[in-house]
Amino acid sequence: RYIRRQRQMCIRDSDGRIWVPKSKGDQRKPKDIPENERDYYLERKYPSFGNLVPRDLASRNAKEVCDAGYGVGSTGDAVYLDFSDAINRLGKDAIKAKYGNLFEMYNRITDDDPYETAMMIYPAVHYTMGGLWVDYNLMTTIPGLYAIGEANFSDHGANRLGASALMQGLADGYFVLPSTINNYLAEHKLDNLDDQNEAFISAEKEVFNKLEKLLSINGTKTVDDFHRELGKLMWNQCGMERSEEGLRKALEELPKIREEFWKNVNVPGTSNDLNQALEKANRVADFLEFAEFMLIDALDREESCGGHFRVESQTEEGEALRNDEKFAYVAAWEFSGIDKKPKLHKEQLVFEEVKLSQRSYK
């Protein structure tokens, strides 16, 4: 996973070049494939930016060439990230100074030397977009509830980088909260609550019943089995590229997976001790509900925007095509219950100083 995610860091620099063989199923070693038989597809398609295109473009194109049969490696789900030109141009020491840590980790995991051969990479699921709204003091719309780090939206746009994620967590935790949350606590008297409160009793009973239900199923499939099945469905139908056909197919398949989960999952252990299998079962149960919201939202938004790319909404050059007239709003879906249609809430996006325009990386 680490190797796959590091592509996003390397690709931001012009030293690494991404390519695949021009012939499908070419199993030769990268060094044995001559230049005229290589397709530097990002440089070919986006000559102005090449390998420095935004990550949504780079990721979508990588999956596209792999799905078309040009991928490399034993699974065919990889493309080459090649530093040979940069090494020849700048020298090994210069590249080592910039990427030595990454190259060393890749070598430890794969036993391949990136200084001698191209690395194999493939896009992986990254952070979801957005975050909770917070005010200047990092408090959400719920009084007393603060959101810090990547849980809030304050420093992140649609595309996130790991370094800025770390930065935000440190900044919020070390510098902002100590100066803001203390003021709130000093000004607000906390109510005296105990475990006999009606709300607590109701919530505790609901959680206990859910835990016992998960433990009592005693089925034949593990939590990981369902997690993997759900992940594959979402990756293929609601990942970097979405289509109406694929989203509708996923909306048909998801309830079946969810139904089987609650009938056939096997969660070992008890609820009386630390039980990581039970913890994960709870998370996957949540994923099975949240995934449906993602599918419904992706199907409803008939445009391409940011990381949401609908194949029906693209330019002749294959770029994301927005529909600002109909979809210039933030969508929030209200949960109405399992197998019930959620309610859509809209907040219009109004731009007074900036004119919306079509992006291009040609």
Predicted regions and their residues:
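Alpha-helix capping and helix-loop boundary segments enriched in small/acidic/polar residues
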Residues: 1, 90-93, 116, 160-168
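Single conserved hydrophobic/aromatic residue that forms the stacking wall/gate
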Residues: 1-11
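Short, structurally constrained coil/turn elements
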Residues: 3, 74-75, 115, 141
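Short Gly/Pro-enriched turn/cap motifs at secondary-structure boundaries
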Residues: 8, 121-124, 299
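Glycine- and aromatic-enriched mobile tails/lids
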Residues: 12-31, 35-61, 65-74, 127, ...
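Glycine-rich, aromatic-lined ligand/substrate-binding cores of catalytic
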Residues: 78, 84, 100
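N-terminal export/ancillary region detector
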Residues: 86-88
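Accessory "access/gating" subregions that flank catalytic or transport cores
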Residues: 90-139
